[in-house]
Amino acid sequence: MPATDRQRVRRSLAAVTLAWFLVLGLPGQATAAPQGGDQRARVEGAFLVNFIRFTEWPRARFASDREPWVVVVVGSEAVAGAVREVAAAAGPVQGRRIAVHQVDGDHLRRQRDILRASHLVFVDRSGGVSAQDAIELLQGTHVLTVGDSAGFVRAGGMLALVASGPRVGFVANPVAIRRGGLTVSAKVLKLAQDTTP
């Protein structure tokens, strides 16, 4: 690789790493969770954007180079709206915009095709859906599954956002990630508060 290409890659990695640490705080630390549901949803949205940024999907998951990342929030429209706001502020990730859709937990099975065609599904408690139902629905797909409790990864989910007092961090299930045919950056997995084998 020519020196200028290496320099560009290093600068890009440095910028992405800086952005990651600005969102997550220092390595090994969680991000302070602002008070209020909307603020917490924005922090969760920042995590979701960065999970997309640091995850590799099989190339076949995209019909074209312009196809957006599709994030589905199983939960309230308020949570989906906050995630949508953060995604818009983040701008394109790897040249793709992020489209955020909301699915009500009552209609989970009817929305099966939308969920299975997405890249990331965030199961928020406000959706009233059991972790097991969502995970079973997404079996055999290349969809990054993220929940909002540690029980989500114990049930077979890939990542879960967890609050510890005023801070938000995450836990990971590397086995479920590999089983889903995805690769989450090892640097990200090292930042997880816990990993479930």
Which residues does each PLM region occupy?
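Short hydrophobic alpha-helices and adjacent helix-cap/hinge residues
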Residues: 2-197
